C-alpha cells in the first residue's frame, strides 16, 4: 500500500490500482484486484466490470462484517458500461463519480446502491398485454376460509354409496334408468342435493303434475300410445344448458343492435307529416232560407219495435258439470301439495345423507315415498274424472255438425225414400256428425212414418235415439259406412 501511495502521482498503473483498491478493497484483496487488472489488459473499466461480476457471485454473509463503524468519505468510481453492438445507435448516459459514505449501512445492504444504472433512449417494441388465468392466481385467505366453512359438516362418501342411496330414494315411481342417474351424478360432481333436485325436475311425475296425465292411466285409455324415452332428452338438457345461454345472449344483443340501427334510419329519412288546416265553413248572414214544412222536433223518435228479451233456460247438467270441475281442481291441488311435500322430504334426506346421518336420511326417504304415493293416487283420480267428463261430452254436438231433415209434409213412403237418399249422401263424413229427422206433429200418418223409419234403421243395424217425446230421431251418420248399406247403388 505504501508503494502504491508513493508512486501514485507518477505511475498511471499505480493510480488505476489505487482507484480499484479504494472501490473494491472491502470485498477483495490486493492480489485479486491486481489479477483482475492484468486480466483486463490494464483497463480500469473492464477490471471494474470483472470485479463487480465477482462481487455478485460472492455470498452475502461476507458483506456483514465491517472493520470500523465510523466512515470517512471516499471517492468511489463506478465503471462505465460497455455498450452492446445491437444498442450502438442508442444514446447511453455515462455515470458520474458520486461522493458517498461507506459505513455501517453499506456493509448491510451492499454497495450496489452507489452504482448508477445506465438509461437508454432506445425505442421500445410494442408488446401484447399479459393474459392472466384465474386458475393460476393463488387463493387468498378469505377464499380458503369460505371454502373451509362450506365444507364443514359434509362427509365424503364413495360414489357407489351415493348412487345406491339415490336409486333407493327415487326408485319407486321414477321413470329414469340407472344409467341416467349415474350420468347426472357425474355431471353434478356426486353432490347428493344437486343430483336429487336435477332428477326430480326430470321425473315424469313432476312433468305431468300440471297436465293431469300419468303413464299408468294413459296406457289404459290409449293402448296404442307409445311413451317416448326421456333419458336422451334429459342428458341433452344438461349438456346444452350452457350453450343455450350463450346463444340466447348473443341473439338478444344482435336484435337490439339491429333495432337501434332501424330507429336511426327511420329518424333520418322520415319527415314529419304535413299539417293541413281544415276548411272553414263560411256562413252567410242575411240570406233568406226556404220555408220548412212540418212541425219542429223536440225529442228523438221512438222505436216502435221493442227489444225482444230472450230468456235462456239453464241446463240441468250445469250443476253436475260444475261439481265435476270442482272435484277435478281439488284433485289437481292435492297432487301439487303432495309433490311439494315429497320434494321437501327428499331434499332433507339428501342433506342428512351428506352429513353422515344415515338413519335419519332413511326415515325421511320413507316419508317422501308416502307423499309420492299419495300424489300418484290423486293424479289417477283426476285423470279418471277427466276421462269421465270427456265420455259424457262425447254425446254432445254442435249445430253445424247436424243435418236436419223435415218429414212433416211427406207421406210414409216418400219420407222413407228421402231418408235413404240422405243416409247415402252424409254417411261416413266426419264434418257431419248427426242426422236429425223431424217427423212433425202427431197426425194420422205419424205412426206409419215412424214405423217405416225404425224398421229401416233396425234392418241396417244403425243406432238411433229419440228426442222431444219421439217427434225427433237422431242418427249418428259419421260412424256409418255407406258401402255397407243394402240400398246403396253397387
Curated annotation (Swiss-Prot):
Pfam families recorded: DUF1771, UBA_At5g58720
SMART domains with a match to the protein in the record: DUF1771
Name of the encoding gene: SDE5
PANTHER family linked: NUCLEAR RNA EXPORT FACTOR SDE5-RELATED (PTHR47872:SF1)
Disruption phenotype: Elongated and curled downward leaves. Upon infection, over-accumulation of cucumber mosaic virus (CMV) RNA and enhanced susceptibility to CMV.
GO CC, any one term: cytoplasmic ribonucleoprotein granule
Organism per entry: Arabidopsis thaliana
Keywords for the protein's UniProt record, in alphabetical order: Plant defense, RNA-mediated gene silencing
Record-level GO BP terms: defense response; ta-siRNA processing
Protein name: Putative nuclear RNA export factor SDE5
Protein's UniProt keywords contain Ubl conjugation: no
Entry superkingdom: Eukaryota
Primary role: Involved in sense transgene post-transcriptional gene silencing (S-PTGS). Not involved in repeat-induced transgene silencing (IR-PTGS). Essential component of the trans-acting short interfering RNA (tasiRNA) pathway. Required for the production of tasiRNAs. Acts together with RDR6 in generating double-stranded RNA from specific single-stranded RNAs. May be involved in the transport of RNA molecules that are converted into a double-stranded form by RDR6. Involved in virus-induced silencing. Not involved in the biogenesis of microRNAs and 24 nt siRNAs produced by DCL3.
Amino acid at each position: 500500500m505504501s508503494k502504491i501511495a508513493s508512486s501514485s502521482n507518477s505511475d498511471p498503473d499505480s493510480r488505476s490500482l489505487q482507484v480499484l483498491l479504494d472501490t473494491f478493497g472491502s470485498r477483495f484483496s490486493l492480489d485479486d484486484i491486481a489479477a483482475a487488472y492484468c486480466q483486463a489488459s490494464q483497463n480500469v473499466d473492464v477490471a471494474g466490470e470483472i470485479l463487480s461480476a465477482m462481487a455478485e457471485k460472492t455470498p452475502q454473509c461476507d458483506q456483514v462484517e465491517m472493520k470500523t463503524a465510523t466512515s470517512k468519505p471516499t471517492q468511489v468510481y463506478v465503471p462505465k458500461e460497455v455498450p452492446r453492438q445491437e444498442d450502438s445507435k442508442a444514446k447511453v448516459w455515462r455515470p458520474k463519480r458520486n461522493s458517498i459514505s461507506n459505513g455501517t449501512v453499506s456493509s448491510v445492504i451492499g454497495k450496489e446502491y452507489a452504482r448508477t444504472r445506465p438509461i437508454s433512449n432506445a425505442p421500445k417494441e410494442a408488446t401484447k398485454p399479459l393474459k392472466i388465468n384465474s386458475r393460476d392466481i393463488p387463493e387468498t385467505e378469505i377464499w380458503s376460509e369460505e371454502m373451509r366453512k362450506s365444507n364443514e359438516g359434509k362427509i365424503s362418501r364413495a360414489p357407489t354409496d351415493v348412487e345406491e342411496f339415490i336409486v333407493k330414494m327415487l326408485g319407486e315411481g321414477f321413470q329414469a334408468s340407472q344409467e341416467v342417474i349415474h350420468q347426472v351424478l357425474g355431471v353434478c360432481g356426486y353432490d347428493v342435493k344437486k343430483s336429487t333436485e336435477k332428477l326430480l325436475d326430470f321425473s315424469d311425475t313432476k312433468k305431468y303434475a300440471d297436465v293431469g296425465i300419468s303413464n299408468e292411466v294413459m296406457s289404459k285409455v290409449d293402448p296404442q300410445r307409445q311413451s317416448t324415452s326421456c333419458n336422451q332428452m334429459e342428458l341433452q338438457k344438461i349438456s346444452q344448458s350452457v350453450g343455450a345461454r350463450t346463444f340466447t345472449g348473443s341473439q338478444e344483443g344482435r336484435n337490439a343492435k339491429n333495432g337501434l340501427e332501424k330507429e336511426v334510419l327511420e329518424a333520418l329519412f322520415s319527415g314529419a307529416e304535413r299539417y293541413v288546416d281544415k276548411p272553414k265553413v263560411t256562413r252567410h248572414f242575411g240570406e233568406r232560407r226556404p220555408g220548412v214544412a212540418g212541425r219542429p222536433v223536440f225529442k228523438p223518435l221512438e222505436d216502435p219495435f221493442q227489444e225482444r228479451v230472450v230468456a235462456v233456460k239453464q241446463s240441468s247438467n250445469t250443476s253436475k258439470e260444475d261439481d265435476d270441475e270442482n272435484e277435478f281442481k281439488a284433485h289437481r291441488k292435492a297432487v301439487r301439495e303432495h309433490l311439494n311435500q315429497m320434494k321437501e322430504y327428499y331434499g332433507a334426506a339428501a342433506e342428512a345423507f351428506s352429513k353422515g346421518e344415515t338413519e335419519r336420511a332413511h326415515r325421511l326417504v320413507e316419508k317422501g315415498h308416502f307423499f309420492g304415493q299419495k300424489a300418484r293416487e290423486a293424479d289417477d283420480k283426476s285423470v279418471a274424472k277427466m276421462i269421465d267428463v270427456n265420455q259424457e261430452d262425447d254425446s254432445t254436438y254442435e249445430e253445424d255438425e247436424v243435418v236436419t231433415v223435415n218429414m212433416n209434409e211427406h207421406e210414409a213412403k216418400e219420407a222413407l225414400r228421402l231418408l235413404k237418399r240422405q243416409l247415402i249422401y252424409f254417411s261416413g263424413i266426419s264434418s257431419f256428425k248427426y242426422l236429425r229427422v223431424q217427423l212433425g206433429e202427431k197426425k194420422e200418418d205419424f205412426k206409419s212414418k215412424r214405423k217405416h223409419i225404425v224398421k229401416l234403421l233396425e234392418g241396417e243395424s244403425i243406432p238411433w235415439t229419440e228426442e222431444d217425446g219421439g217427434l225427433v230421431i237422431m242418427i249418428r251418420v259419421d260412424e256409418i259406412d255407406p258401402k255397407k248399406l243394402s240400398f246403396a247403388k253397387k
